[in-house]
Amino acid sequence: IKTNKFNHLINDKLKGFDKKLSLKTNDIFLKLKLNNNSININIDNPKIYSGSEFIDLSKIDINLDLIKFIKNDNSIKNIQIISKENPIKTLTNFINSYKFNASRFVIFNQIESGNIQAKTNIYFDEENQNDFTYEVTGKVNNAKLNTLNETFVSNINFNFDIKNQIFNFDNINLRYDNIDFQSKKIRISKSGKNFEVKGDLSNKKGLIKPNTFSK
């Protein structure tokens, strides 16, 4: 079923999370699944806004509990958000507009170029919709960084999986100081106030300057 009935519901949920956020949608499709008492809402090609900054999305799928929806209770089971391939600068501008952080702003300013695509799954607690878990997977292509000492890291490509404060990166390739580096996998996990990093790093044959990792 094609409908616009849920436009306000979705935007109200977003604004309940943060008033800065809004969603621009075209057509919304509704699928009723009586076999498991659920409603699926499918939104194609929406845009999510924070002020004037926005991210292009490929689709949003929302799974609702039918009975709870009829009773006007907490009805959202899970949400899947799939983005289009966006410039990384578009994403960082969106994040800065949504919630500015000076330290993060300095880091973001080091990003010269590159593209990112991601899929986010959000699973809501049945009793309290303010409690949820999430998983973000995706890939970064052809990114380039300009570090504070004017040294460039280029040709950055990797896949990522973020879940429960654990960051997994795989198939990593990058070029630094005219040397190509690769990593099969790097895992970063939070341990108290610190982060623990595990993984591998290798390089193709090339001359490594003594100060490459101490600049």
Language-model features: where?
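Extended amphipathic, helix-rich lipid-handling scaffolds
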Residues: 10, 14-16, 21, 79-131, ...
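Short, exposed beta-strand/loop patches in secreted or surface proteins that constitute
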Residues: 30-32, 158-160, 186-188
